[in-house]
Amino acid sequence: MAKPSYVKFEVPAELAEKALEAVELARDTGRIRKGTNETTKAVERGQAKLVIIAEDVDPEEIVAHLPPLCEEKEIPYIYVPSKKELGAAAGIEVPAASVAIIEPGKGRELVEEIAMKVRELMK
């Protein structure tokens, strides 16, 4: 299956797993924003430290604006394969198309590591 048009780079599976782990840590010890509307606001306000976008969002237009917006605001973003997994990591019982980490809490070092690796992938 072809990747959606908004997926700008390939994310290794282990890095996607780390992103989900960072969401869980931030959920428990920091602050996150769940869903595309809250994520978009966090990016526009410059509050997001890392944005996580699901690759299986349909229709694509729901999240297609996030990668260019993150690039404009210089906020790192990463893709994970499943909105269902992303929703579970965010602590909600429904799928989440995107999540923004506002305060990483105990996941700070993990978020910084992911952000560094994402910058390398985007080159």
Curated annotation (Swiss-Prot):
GO cellular component terms given for this protein: cytoplasm; ribonucleoprotein complex; ribosome
* One GO term of the biological process aspect: ribosome biogenesis
Q: Which GO terms describe its molecular function?
A: ribonuclease P activity; rRNA binding; structural constituent of ribosome
- Keyword Oxidoreductase attributed: no
- Listed InterPro entries: eL8/uL1-like (IPR050257), Ribosomal_eL30-like_sf (IPR029064), Ribosomal_eL8-like_CS (IPR004037), Ribosomal_eL8/eL30/eS12/Gad45 (IPR004038), Ribosomal_eL8/Nhp2 (IPR018492), Ribosomal_eL8_arc (IPR022481)
Question: At the top level of its lineage, which domain of life is listed?
Answer: Archaea
Q: Which keywords does the record carry?
A: Cytoplasm, Ribonucleoprotein, Ribosomal protein, RNA-binding, rRNA-binding, tRNA processing
Asked whether the UniProt record includes tRNA processing among its keywords, one would answer yes
Question: Where is it mainly found?
Answer: cytoplasm
* Cell compartment(s), UniProt: Cytoplasm
Q: Which PANTHER family match?
A: RIBOSOMAL PROTEIN L7AE FAMILY MEMBER
Per UniProt, subunit arrangement is: Part of the 50S ribosomal subunit. Probably part of the RNase P complex.
Q: NCBIfam families in the record, alphabetically?
A: eL8_ribo
Purpose: Multifunctional RNA-binding protein that recognizes the K-turn motif in ribosomal RNA, the RNA component of RNase P, box H/ACA, box C/D and box C'/D' sRNAs.
Q: Which family does it belong to?
A: Belongs to the eukaryotic ribosomal protein eL8 family.
Q: What is this protein called?
A: Large ribosomal subunit protein eL8
Organism listed in the record: Thermococcus onnurineus (strain NA1)
